[in-house]
Amino acid sequence: MSIFNYTEEQMAAASSTFTIHEIYQQPATWRKTCAQLAACKDELQKFLDQVVKAEDFDIVLTGAGTSEFVGNSLYHALNKKYNFKVKSYASTDIVPNPEDTLSRTKPTLLVNFGRSGNSPESVGSVEAAEVVCENIYHLFVTCNSEGALSKLADKHDNCFALNLTPETHDKSFAMTSSYSNMYL
């Protein structure tokens, strides 16, 4: 098979097999992600309404590394949509000083983006929010239904996991399908 005029042998020789496949598969994964979102739209909206229907609230977008950039990329569009109540912080900023980034009293939606959903910073930001916030909800957007964040959602009513399809859980070092699908 040839992708972008590279044979499998050429991709393997350049150690780029996963990256090239993951770039190439993106349009197909985007369609699946859009269908997945459409299928859970009502359930997700009901979950979000627990926070966004409050008079005052915060939405905090977070992640580590490239996953943080998903939140940073969405920040401006979402901040305007939600009357300037959206913030974006690296999970590595939340974990050591959650009082500096999270409101104790406002209803807060912590949106955690994570390819694996297993990073210590992702799990740590959830744990810190549970301690600091009186009214916290968690939306986990991950590419791994077996990850720690997804498993937390199974155990807690204040959590919602949006686990993207398995092929978005990139194997390459570069986050391609995972980044673009978490952004969607």
Model regions: which residues?
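Glycine-rich phosphate-binding loops that contact phosphosugars or nucleotide phosphates
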Residues: 53-184
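Cofactor-/ligand-binding subdomain signature composed of acidic, glycine-rich
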Residues: 1-53, 172-184
